[in-house]
């Protein structure tokens, strides 16, 4: 089998290019150079970092891209006007089959627009989608789909999201029979607006065809409870849940720290106990840490395109690279196309 080539956007993210280069170097060294990295970005900013990390012995090439799509750029406009950007050029390499996957912690909207514009859709896919991880009670994670790529969804779109994410979970996440729940205002059949009733019927039909394991409606409190592996909703609802979830650790932390300090000052708690409590608090919220998985793929585009959080660290970049490798090896896109054809 030929060595895989993964393109990494050196200019993507708030901490680029330093954290991107560091994460790329870590991935290659940790993996024993089992794949090739094509790092793409502005030469004057990236090459000094490559020298700093003594990357000569690594399976890494560099390609200059003079333009950068920033977090402030309007996605659709930037993708069209900045054709020489690292983001667009990296995806074009994948389209031309000169690389197997593209990884970036850059502008999410631009990544979605460019992935669709450059790579196109897999056969049978009506709309590509993006999902998010949520912690859950017990083992595993809950995946919510869609979380912002599609805010105006038809029932058939929601069903395809469930089907594509089912394939991803089976082969990329090694979940044998992931359960699918439809987010609604009640768990009984017949609840919710008309488009959700129609979606329920289509999901049930997909389950009868053995495409998914549909368990019915789920409610908001079921997300963290882990009732379903996959929770399906439109992008407006999903993005709202995602942003709310991201705010939880910061909000509780802002309450916890002063309360802890007050207890120490009052003598109700000594410093060592406070330190242990702080460690416990940090451990509780580890499942909310986006660094663990690094990023998420756009499901339904004709190529592997993985986007990370704008604040991605070197650890997140490294894990995105591993995710790309695993998706390629498990032929996730081929399996999605086969299901939908």
Curated annotation (Swiss-Prot):
EC numbers on record: 2.3.1.274
One cellular component (GO) term of this entry: cytoplasm
Places the protein is found: Cytoplasm
Reactions performed catalytically: a fatty acyl-[ACP] + phosphate = an acyl phosphate + holo-[ACP]
Enzyme class label: transferase
Gene3D superfamilies, per the entry: Isopropylmalate Dehydrogenase
Family that this chain belongs to: Belongs to the PlsX family.
Quaternary state and interactors: Homodimer. Probably interacts with PlsY.
PANTHER family assigned: FATTY ACID/PHOSPHOLIPID SYNTHESIS PROTEIN PLSX, PHOSPHATE ACYLTRANSFERASE
Free-text function comment from the UniProt entry: Catalyzes the reversible formation of acyl-phosphate (acyl-PO(4)) from acyl-[acyl-carrier-protein] (acyl-ACP). This enzyme utilizes acyl-ACP as fatty acyl donor, but not acyl-CoA.
Name by which UniProt lists this protein: Phosphate acyltransferase
Organism placement in taxonomy: Bacteria, Pseudomonadati, Chlorobiota, Chlorobiia, Chlorobiales
Gene: plsX
